[in-house]
Amino acid sequence: MADLQTQMKQAVADAAVEQIKDGMVLGLGSGSTAALMIQGLGAKLASGELKDIVGVTTSFQGEVLAAELNIPLLSLNAVSRIDLAIDGADEVDPGFQLIKGGGACHVQEKLVAARADRFVVVVDSTKLVDRLNLGFLLPVEVLPGAWRQVKQQLEALGGSAELRMAQRKAGPVVTDQGNLVLDAKLDGGISDPVALEQTINNIPGVLENGLFVNITDEVLVGEITDGVAGVRSLQKRLS
């Protein structure tokens, strides 16, 4: 299964790179699928197939990878607009609402996505769900001095919340902004992502949460059909 998932991720990353045009300012996402996209971009720049590209990264991980591939970078504050942002997601529901933040980068990811003229999400088919938060926890970035208070208020919404602990250091995960992350699980999942995003962000001490609502223009889905990896494009319907 792992090999099939890798094939799906590679296929969708390659499809995303095909959307990149000369002269673009790009939002470069975080996570395993976005990393494959960044590698593909680096290869096309090195070969001369693409030129005059500038990237804006969403994490320290992406910044290091892009620098290794000699992709020119600018900070978010240094650009007036982003032509195209490409990023992964942890879950995508039928309304194109997302949960992101498995890598604790969702604050910068949301800033970049909001600045972009087009926001394209790249996922493998395992990330498509009927309802958010039934499988993947919702990350909430909080000020270190407020995490207990925020935890209580998240649990008052109906569910549980736990401080995310680091895997290879003692203590909690610390974000690129120096904050902590609470992972929330709501009873029955998230029925109204739009309302919940605002409700959580109104809690004092919360910097941002991992719900990305009404921001995605296209979802590229890597999937296996008859043993072969392919890509399906889901376009948002205009209301």
Swiss-Prot record:
Catalytic residues identified in the record: E109 (proton acceptor)
InterPro entries (UniProt xref): NagB/RpiA_transferase-like, Ribose5P_isomerase_typA_subgr, Ribose5P_isomerase_type_A
Segments passing through the bilayer: none
Pathway it works in: Carbohydrate degradation; pentose phosphate pathway; D-ribose 5-phosphate from D-ribulose 5-phosphate (non-oxidative stage): step 1/1
Ligand binding (substrate): S30, G31, S32, T33, D87, G88, A89, D90, K100, G101, G102, G103, K127
Source taxon at top rank: Bacteria
Listed GO MF terms: ribose-5-phosphate isomerase activity
Pfam families in the record: Rib_5-P_isom_A
Keywords assigned by UniProt, alphabetized: Isomerase
Database matches in CDD domains: RPI_A
GO-annotated biological processes: D-ribose metabolic process; pentose-phosphate shunt, non-oxidative branch
Entry GO terms, CC: cytosol
Known catalytic reactions: aldehydo-D-ribose 5-phosphate = D-ribulose 5-phosphate
Enzyme Commission number, as recorded: 5.3.1.6
EC supergroup of this enzyme: isomerase
Self-association state and partner proteins as the record states: Homodimer.
Family: Belongs to the ribose 5-phosphate isomerase family.
NCBIfam families on file: PRK00702.1 (NF001924), rpiA (TIGR00021)
General function of this protein: Catalyzes the reversible conversion of ribose-5-phosphate to ribulose 5-phosphate.
Protein name per Swiss-Prot or TrEMBL: Ribose-5-phosphate isomerase A
Species of the source: Synechococcus sp. (strain CC9605)
Gene that this polypeptide is encoded by: rpiA
